[in-house]
UniProtKB/Swiss-Prot annotation:
<comment type="function">
    <text>Involved in the export of arginine. Important to control the intracellular level of arginine and the correct balance between arginine and lysine.</text>
</comment>
<dbReference type="InterPro" id="IPR004777">
    <property type="entry name" value="Lys/arg_exporter"/>
</dbReference>
<feature type="transmembrane region" description="Helical">
    <location>
        <begin position="1"/>
        <end position="21"/>
    </location>
</feature>
<feature type="transmembrane region" description="Helical">
    <location>
        <begin position="147"/>
        <end position="167"/>
    </location>
</feature>
<comment type="similarity">
    <text>Belongs to the LysE/ArgO transporter (TC 2.A.75) family.</text>
</comment>
<keyword id="KW-0813">Transport</keyword>
<keyword id="KW-1133">Transmembrane helix</keyword>
<feature type="transmembrane region" description="Helical">
    <location>
        <begin position="111"/>
        <end position="131"/>
    </location>
</feature>
<feature type="transmembrane region" description="Helical">
    <location>
        <begin position="68"/>
        <end position="88"/>
    </location>
</feature>
<dbReference type="GO" id="GO:0061459">
    <property type="term" value="F:L-arginine transmembrane transporter activity"/>
</dbReference>
<keyword id="KW-0812">Transmembrane</keyword>
<dbReference type="InterPro" id="IPR023445">
    <property type="entry name" value="Arg_export_ArgO_enterobac"/>
</dbReference>
<keyword id="KW-0997">Cell inner membrane</keyword>
<dbReference type="InterPro" id="IPR001123">
    <property type="entry name" value="LeuE-type"/>
</dbReference>
<keyword id="KW-0029">Amino-acid transport</keyword>
<feature type="transmembrane region" description="Helical">
    <location>
        <begin position="37"/>
        <end position="57"/>
    </location>
</feature>
<dbReference type="Pfam" id="PF01810">
    <property type="entry name" value="LysE"/>
</dbReference>
Length: 211
């Protein structure tokens, strides 16, 4: 059964490595050393719920509900555009230190709300957990399925805590005005690229619904 664990772990690592809203948010919180371990835990727990739902039957709900998928997609597009705009606005600020200080004033609950939005309004999360993992893990018998899910969930916990701790460790180098500007530009551009990609997929999906 251990082979199914490592299959799930490898697939989980492959899906979580690319820079996305979750990774960018965890990295930024780590650099700020602001609730970064709490955010890593909440991201990993969210993945635990989504991965379990996808592998143990939730994929059927999403695949049978095209309007739900469309709603999630366009909600994600709107959020990613807003999130990317915020990052670019901070990067282009004439007083980057003041802009960064304003971000640091955010309370715990606002940070948690942003993390939940970054996770649960990202359609790629549902495609990864419900469609990819659901189609692969859903075909397994119950015992191998549990090991497969455990491997994928382990990858998520290891990655988010590792990213948060590494970013916090590198914080002295990454907190400089130049580094912060580069990071915010990179995050903003990536968020907008993902949003435009999702918008294209959303248009194609809506076209299929009405034809």
């Amino acid at each position: 059964m251990i082979s199914y664990y490592f299959q799930g772990f490898a697939l989980g690592v492959a899906m979580i490595l690319p820079l996305g809203p979750q990774n960018a948010f965890v990295m930024n919180q780590g650099i700020r050393r602001q609730y970064h371990l709490m955010i890593a835990l909440l991201c990993a727990l969210s993945d635990l719920v989504l991965i379990s739902a996808g592998i143990f039957g939730g994929s059927a709900l999403l695949m049978q509900s095209p309007w739900l998928l469309a709603l999630v997609t366009w909600g994600g597009v709107a959020f990613l555009l807003w999130y990317g705009f915020g990052a670019l606005k901070t990067a282009m600020s004439s007083n980057l230190e003041l802009a960064s200080a304003e971000v640091m004033k955010q309370g715990r609950w606002k940070i948690i709300a942003t993390m939940l939005a970054v996770t649960w309004l990202n359609p790629h999360v549902y495609l990864d957990t419900f469609v990819v993992l659901g189609s692969l893990g859903g075909q397994l018998a119950m015992e191998p399925k549990r090991w497969f899910a455990l491997g994928t969930i382990s990858a998520s916990f290891l990655w988010f805590f590792g990213l948060a701790l590494l970013a916090a460790w590198l914080a002295p180098r990454l907190r400089t005005a130049k580094a912060q500007r580069i990071i915010n530009i990179l995050v903003g551009v990536v968020m907008w690229l993902i949003a435009f990609q999702l918008a294209r997929e959303g248009v194609a999906h809506m076209h299929a619904l009405f034809n």
